[in-house]
A protein has these predicted regions:
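Feature 926 captures the class I aminoacyl-tRNA synthetase adenylation module centered on the KMSKS loop
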Residues: 1-221
């Protein structure tokens, strides 16, 4: 609950400061970053799983997956994208970050409404009703979200998850070797069997360089 509320508060605070209007600035697929597409894919995958779980009365299963999803949304997507929200320039990249987070939150509160009726209603009123007066009066009067298959890019999910795993292993290696993150290192070595995943990691190495505080990465066999 705290994580969900913190994500909502983060969006509400900065969107209000910047005067972002989600109705006038819908998602533009051409301006989305890799992580935007990834969290959208994860969101629609969650919608699909939520629908299946609730149909079979397995709320417990859904909540476990929801906790994992919230952790990724908060501790990966938002943490990695803070600079996009904080920067002074009101450019397309910043608008895409806001539009993505609004899309995610709008779907998340509708997904979770049957399980967390009061929290989802409060967020809905502040987030959706304040933005669109033509929207339903309550989250509980909204249609349940439908997963859009074309948004569930499984290859992208696989690639970003591999990138995250590489960073996690890098942090673990630093901890074992007693090298703090604040101490820059010249190179990080990584090994992966899949050439496509390796290519993705190299193409997005800036994330690894920043997360692990290294100057370069190199694949080893």
């Amino acid at each position: 609950l705290i994580t969900l509320w913190n994500v909502y508060s983060f969006y509400a605070t900065y969107a209000s400061v910047d005067g972002f209007d989600p109705i006038k600035n819908p998602i533009d697929q051409n301006n989305l970053s890799i992580l935007d597409k990834w969290i959208i894919a994860k969101t629609h995958l969650l919608i699909k799983y939520a629908d299946q779980s609730l149909d079979t009365y397995r709320v417990d299963r859904f909540m476990k997956s929801f906790e994992v999803y919230l952790d990724e949304l908060s501790n990966w997507y938002i943490r990695r994208n803070r600079r996009r929200f904080w920067k002074s320039e009101d450019d397309e990249d910043k608008k895409s970050a806001y539009a993505t987070l609004f899309h995610v939150l709008e779907n998340v509160i509708k997904i979770i409404a049957p399980v967390l009726p009061f929290v989802s209603e409060v967020i809905y009123q502040n987030l959706i009703r304040n933005s669109d007066k033509n929207s339903s009066e309550s989250v509980h009067l909204c249609d349940y979200p439908i997963a859009i298959e074309e948004h569930i890019n499984k290859n992208l999910i696989k690639n970003v998850d591999a990138l995250k795993k590489t960073i996690e292993l890098g942090r673990s290696a630093r901890s074992i070797s007693d090298f703090r993150i604040r101490q820059p290192l010249s190179k990080a070595l990584f090994a992966v069997e899949d050439d496509k995943i390796s290519k993705f990691i190299v193409e997005n190495q800036d994330i690894i360089l920043d997360e692990l505080n290294v100057k370069s990465i190199e694949r080893i066999s």
